[in-house]
């Protein structure tokens, strides 16, 4: 194998195995920043040895063994340094008592081969609430997504130094706060899991409907969020909201190819060619939703949103959509996760089920809500309802206001076209 081919093989293996390697190192050293350094050192070792010695029969095992050794060496060094600082005034038996437990714990951690638990710990640590939302997203994509700083920066249209600083600060914050590398206890788990799901869905949403830039969608972000969601569902198969989120993302991703035309312009849901929807993703989404439902209990916001997406997925054409059922699901969603955005979406469903006049009354009641003051979908929805009611001049004004508020160029073009056509 040529050196170039070997490097390509290393890159491919690394992209798949990096999260597991970082997770295993973090299990031993209890610091995700140090763990990533050790993982990078292991990658450098592979780049040095494999072109000379050949690619191992089991590349992933080679990397895992190498990072374990480096992690244990780091723990030994730190334990010895700590012992030397404390040895003044102590006998050697006291010194040994100080050193041995740390090494024993590290050896026990390194010998535990349950990589699934390690990944789950890394997910919870990367999404810890002590971090800002932006920091959680960046750190998760770096450690668990295997994305480079440059790739994250390009995905979110953010300068690379800004992303790099976010990641560095996130690692420092986790270390300073002494955040344990562990799966949270039962009483803390719901809130911590909600933080994880929020991060994954934020990544997906930015791919599904980009908030800024020249592209309407960024499929690579959707793919990454889906991958993380599927990994999490495999590690936590009895969590209905995890399954609900996976179902929601699968169903929404199934429409990705139909959401833009050949020129990359947005195509709204009711105008989409449903033959372009991905049937495999629809089946996967419906199956995940069924598993979430079978777990019982009160349906959470992600499971309810997945049920909403399923209503669209089951409709062979737009006119087959059960809008009354969608209104009922939004009623349920408003109970468990009340927000003005949910109310706005419910108003859209009411308009489809019962007519634009009923919906406009609901939308007008939201116009003074400060949470929606800069939300471009409010004037967009209002413009659509006014157009259906024949109030063209008012509709044009609303679409123009929505165009002023959006930061996505493709969406702005769509809204201005709607203003012209109203």
Predicted regions and their residues:
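Alpha-helical junction/boundary sensor with strong preference for TPR arrays
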Residues: 229, 236, 296, 330, ...
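A short, charge-rich alpha-helical start-of-domain segment used by transcription regulators
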Residues: 1-23, 33-36, 190-198
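Amphipathic helix-loop-helix modules that constitute alpha-helical solenoid scaffolds
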Residues: 78, 86-134, 142-151, 158-331
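"A position-specific structural signal for the A-helix of alpha-solenoid helical repeats
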Residues: 245, 249-252, 305, 309, ...
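Σ70-family region 2.3-2.4 aromatic/basic alpha-helix that recognizes the −10 promoter
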Residues: 43-47, 57-86, 171
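Amphipathic, Lys/Arg- and hydrophobic-enriched alpha-helical face
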Residues: 13-32, 45-49, 124-128, 209-212, ...
């Amino acid at each position: 194998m040529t050196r170039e081919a070997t490097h390509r093989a290393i890159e491919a293996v690394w992209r798949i195995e990096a999260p597991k390697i970082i997770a295993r190192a973090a299990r031993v050293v209890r610091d995700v920043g140090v763990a990533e350094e050790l993982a990078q050192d292991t990658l450098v070792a592979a780049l040095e040895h494999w072109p000379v010695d050949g690619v191992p029969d089991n590349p992933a095992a080679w990397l895992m063994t190498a990072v374990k050794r480096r992690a244990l060496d780091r723990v030994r060094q730190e334990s010895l340094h700590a012992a030397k600082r404390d040895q003044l005034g102590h006998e050697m038996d006291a010194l040994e008592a100080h050193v041995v437990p740390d090494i024993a714990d590290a050896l026990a951690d390194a010998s535990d081969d349950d990589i699934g638990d390690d990944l789950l710990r890394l997910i919870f640590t990367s999404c810890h609430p002590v971090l800002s939302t932006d920091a959680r997203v960046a750190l998760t994509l770096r450690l668990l997504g295997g994305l480079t700083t440059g790739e994250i920066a390009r995905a979110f249209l953010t300068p690379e130094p800004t992303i790099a600083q976010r990641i560095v600060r996130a690692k420092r914050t986790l270390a300073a706060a002494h955040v344990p590398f562990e799966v949270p206890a039962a009483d803390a788990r719901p809130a911590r899991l909600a933080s994880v799901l929020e991060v994954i869905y934020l990544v997906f949403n930015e791919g599904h409907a980009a908030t800024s830039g020249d592209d309407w969608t960024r499929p690579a972000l959707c793919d990454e969020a889906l991958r993380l969601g599927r990994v999490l569902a495999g590690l936590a198969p009895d969590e209905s909201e995890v399954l609900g989120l996976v179902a929601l993302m699968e169903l929404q991703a199934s429409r990705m190819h139909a959401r833009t035309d050949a020129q990359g312009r947005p195509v709204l849901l009711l105008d989409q060619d449903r033959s372009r929807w991905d049937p495999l993703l629809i089946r996967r989404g419906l199956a995940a939703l069924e598993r979430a439902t079978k777990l019982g209990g009160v349906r959470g916001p992600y499971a309810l949103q997945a049920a909403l997406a399923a209503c669209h997925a089951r409709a062979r054409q737009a006119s087959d959509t059960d809008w009354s059922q969608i209104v009922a699901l939004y009623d349920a969603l408003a109970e468990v996760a009340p927000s003005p955005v949910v109310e706005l979406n419910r108003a859209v469903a009411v308009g489809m089920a019962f007519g634009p006049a009923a919906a406009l009354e609901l939308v007008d009641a939201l116009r003074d809500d400060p949470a929606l003051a800069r939300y471009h979908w409010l004037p967009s929805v209002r413009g659509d309802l006014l157009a259906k009611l024949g109030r063209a001049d008012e509709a044009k004004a609303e679409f123009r206001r929505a165009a002023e508020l959006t930061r996505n160029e493709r969406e702005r073009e769509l809204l201005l076209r709607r203003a012209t056509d109203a």
